[in-house]
Amino acid sequence: MVVLLLVATLVALVYYYPEKFICVDSGPVTGDVIVVLGGGLRERPVRAAELFKQHAAPRIIITGFGDDEINRQILLQNGVPASAIEVENKSQSTRDNAEFTIKLLRAEHARRVILVTSWYHSRRALKTFEHYAPDLTFYSRPSYYAFDWKDWPKHGNEHRMRMEFLKLPGYWLWYGVNPF
């Protein structure tokens, strides 16, 4: 009974304060490369282009199967030169994003990496990359919808949050990626 109460309390805290647990934002940083995780959401490459224009990093790697060309076009439309864009288009999961992109990062001797994904995906993405490449330094600069944190359920994010609530412990159990 006590365990159930503790779990219910934790779920309630995460639900009402997702920005404290789910979202990880490292704040303004510079790195060797920006990595944009795929996911079919336009705000990710737009955010990466903003960071590129702010000189956060000189290169961008797009990672993810299926939306790589769309993301490349969005980057180009937002002022990122083609010479600064590299594409990894084999990955189909966050774990794959890390596995395939880390090979590229090591081949290019990148040490400081800025990850761009959606706010609700930022913790799992950051922890997954850190798990598979503890020798590299990763920062999270997620994209945000323009809304008040207290109103996040009203913006179509409940399904995404439920999926993250399942995927965070799932990644811990299956791949050993500690979400804390």
For the regions a protein language model found, what residue spans apply to each?
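Detector for methionine-enriched segments
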Residues: 1, 22, 161-163
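Hydrophobic membrane-insertion alpha-helices, especially the h-region
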Residues: 1-15
